[in-house]
Swiss-Prot record:
Positions occupied by motif Nuclear localization signal: 226-230
Motif LXCXE motif, interaction with host RB1 boundaries: 106-110
Name of the protein described by the UniProt record: Early E1A protein
A single GO cellular-component term on record: host cell nucleus
Self-association and partners: Interacts with host UBE2I; this interaction interferes with polySUMOylation. Interacts with host RB1; this interaction induces the aberrant dissociation of RB1-E2F1 complex thereby disrupting the activity of RB1 and activating E2F1-regulated genes. Interacts with host ATF7; the interaction enhances ATF7-mediated viral transactivation activity which requires the zinc binding domains of both proteins.
Organism: Canine adenovirus serotype 1 (strain CLL) (CAdV-1)
GO molecular function list: zinc ion binding
Recorded coiled-coil stretches: none
Gene Ontology biological process terms, A to Z: regulation of DNA-templated transcription; symbiont-mediated perturbation of host cell cycle G1/S transition checkpoint; symbiont-mediated suppression of host innate immune response; symbiont-mediated suppression of host JAK-STAT cascade via inhibition of STAT1 activity; symbiont-mediated suppression of host type I interferon-mediated signaling pathway
Zinc finger (unnamed): 145-163
Family: Belongs to the adenoviridae E1A protein family.
Keywords from the UniProt entry: Activator, Early protein, G1/S host cell cycle checkpoint dysregulation by virus, Host nucleus, Host-virus interaction, Inhibition of host innate immune response by virus, Inhibition of host interferon signaling pathway by virus, Inhibition of host STAT1 by virus, Interferon antiviral system evasion, Metal-binding, Modulation of host cell cycle by virus, Transcription, Transcription regulation, Viral immunoevasion, Zinc, Zinc-finger
Region feature (Disordered): 189-230
Subcellular location, record wording: Host nucleus
Amino acid sequence: MKLTLEPAPRCLHEYVSQLLEDWQPECLSCEYSHGGSSPPSLHDLFDLELENSRSPSPLLCDWCAEADSESTISTETDVGFTLNTPPVSPLPSYSTSPASIPEDMLLCLEEMPTFDDGDEVRSATTSFEHWENNFDPNVGSFFGCLRCAYYQEQGENSICGLCYLKALAEEPVDADAGEDDEVIFVSAKPGSRKRSAVTSRGSVESSKRPCLPEPEQTEPLDLSLKPRPQ
């Protein structure tokens, strides 16, 4: 076996540069010198011609190129253009006289609203307040509150709304009223309803089978639409 020893290169830098020149591909062949310290740029590696920055790019479509050209034209025409607006005329001053406001409208709202038989809002100087100051409760028979007495003294057999609601609440419920009304009993089981008519005492006594009372409902009603499991 024969071994050959090559002499070591005297200058390592020259040896590496020679190897790079031997193995350099054809696409990278250009006119730049390897002795420069800065690496080559893309413009050195590729042959590109720079066009005017304002000209449209050849890769754009026709519509984009037209829009770009119109925008450049509009910017060129707008340079040095000033908008001349007419001066704004001052608002004319109208001589307004103070509105005639009655003294009743200037009163506090807590003293102002009172209602008469026509349900109209009046001022503090209404006929009701004049009547209230001169009213003698010992003269005449009145029922209800002071407002009801005011209506009754004017010849109206009426009472105010508050006394009317109070009278309705105190009125006893008639037990015989609504005997023939239909009553619907709702059982605890969903979907089952039993209808029965409330009859008089004579018909209950004459019936052969007595009316049994419904069992007391201890289970709450299920108002959902989902059927309950059996």
